[in-house]
Amino acid sequence: MPRCVFLWLLTGLFGLGVSSAAENDLIDPADLSAAVPEELSETLIIATPHFGALGTNEFAANKSTEMTNSAIGRAPMEIKVANPVLYYANRVKAIELARNQKWQEAKPLLQTLTTEFKDDGDTWFALGLTYLGLEQWQEAIEALENALALGTRLFGMPGGGANPNDMMIRLAEAYGQMNDEERAIYWINQALNARWDDRPKLAGTSFYQQGKNPNFKAFETSEAFQQAAGSYLPIELSRDESWRYDLHYLAGEIERLHVHPYHAISVEAFKQKVNDISRRIPELSDKQIVFAFMQLLGTLGNGHNFIVPAFGEKGSFNQLPMQFYWFSDGLFVVTASEPYRQWIGHKVEQVGDMSTLKALELIKTVNPRDNEMQQRWLAPYYIGLPTVLEGLGIVDKADAVSLTLSDSRGARHLISPEIKPMSFAGFPKLPGLSTGESPLYLRNNNENYWFKKLPKQLLYVQFNDVADKESQSLKQFSEQIQQLIIEGEVADMVLDLRHNSGGDGSLNAPMVATTVLFKALRPKGKLFVLIGRNTFSAAHNLAMSITELTDAVLVGEPSGSRPNAISEAGWFNLPYSRQTGVISSQFHQYGAPEDHRIWIAPHVPVSLSSEQYFKGEDPVMTAIIGISSK
């Protein structure tokens, strides 16, 4: 397998040398076919990799219509199902056995199912996972190749996602277990060409999963594997060359991962920005280089593009010891660490010598977004990062940030808070009150989901993260709510998504079903869905699904995304600095093809002022109780 295919892409795109050692391994794109083992060349029709020179129409293409297989040329096979009733019963049983990792019991059923009916990608996928569980690697490969050719949407299975690029990684892992490095790397590269979105998992640098992938242990130190994994760093690079290597890698991952990288910036302008950053690297500090990378991502023009500059080995940021929120009447301090808690509740009038509104406007260049509600949500987060403030000219020096605050009487106070190393546990949510009892919507907004029965049979459900809890899956939680509805304990229902910025959208279906069940059993009952600036990504998709299937009443602010939007978080980890971030890898259409709304607008618009927040009031729930009682 030729090495440094990816390095060829990076250096070929931008004309920026990395090192002579790397250049010795560059290959011509015409030779790419040689990288495919002959016996594998016809197993899959893959979308054409985006290799070439910047400035071609190919690079500006929207990748959302690309497919990893072909529906043309694969004729349906003969159906050999003698007893359809028994077939269906066995299909249900076999998939459930596979879900519970009862591989030995699932295996004969799935073998029979795929013999009787060969055109169901779901059963081939379940059989492939079963063979993987039984360490029958060659059999797993054959089953997964069939699943890949047919396609599947069988989710909730252990050890493998149903997306085509995830299946390609499973194929690579099977070859890895067989110590076949060439075929393993071939399938890794196929997955990368199909925009596989968690490349750091290969190198053990994933944001969510620590440790290297054990399936590739036999050759994890080889240069070819490290190139595919994105962890290779040429030796004897200078500091500036190493940062340029990261820049090339980031630009290449934008080109590989982003579903439509040039919808907001031209190819030529993007190339110029990369060249400008490369030229300036010798004069920039490590933190300033990471800021320049943030600005590069900021040109992409949609919300799932950012760096989290908290976990890198080089260039990680500091932050101010306080959190801000943009209320209807301005930017305020909502929480702070000691000794700055006395400033909670104060309005931010100036950042350095610049007015807060002007500073917030400048933040837009590092805050790629789906709409301007996302600016309301995330601009306060960026205000808390001194390197961003310095890079945008809001302050002169990142280590000397001053804030002008005003209290409720209008008195002004100039403070210079001491910066601290950056920590990150997710983008900020509006916190509970620092003093006194918090209102219902702020009490447990770091818990994934919970509910409370309110007077007059009003059920309040707060859904904050689209992710399973260890103690109770989202499906189990939804079933618990469904039982309350069935038992007649709910007259009206509230689903609060104001703190929910997303997660795993494949988990949403049970909650959608819960809202549909409520409307079916309580046709005169009111279903309220609360939305706002934080309602984003998988949570936004949930809100769209509910509004398509029910007559839910939307209450709050406009949402933080669009019905049809470039979305999905494709993770990257830079080889030198180890900075982590995401790039938008998919287009999600939850509205009609011609749904051009810039957000989901509430039926009952309600804003939140600083006075209401600090008094512990929730004007959204006040409005709902008023409507519910009618």
Regions found by a protein language model. Give the residues of each.
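Conserved acidic, small-residue-rich alpha-beta core segments centered on
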Residues: 346, 487-494, 498-629
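Flexible, low-complexity junctional segments that flank or bridge functional domains
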Residues: 21, 45, 57, 69-82, ...
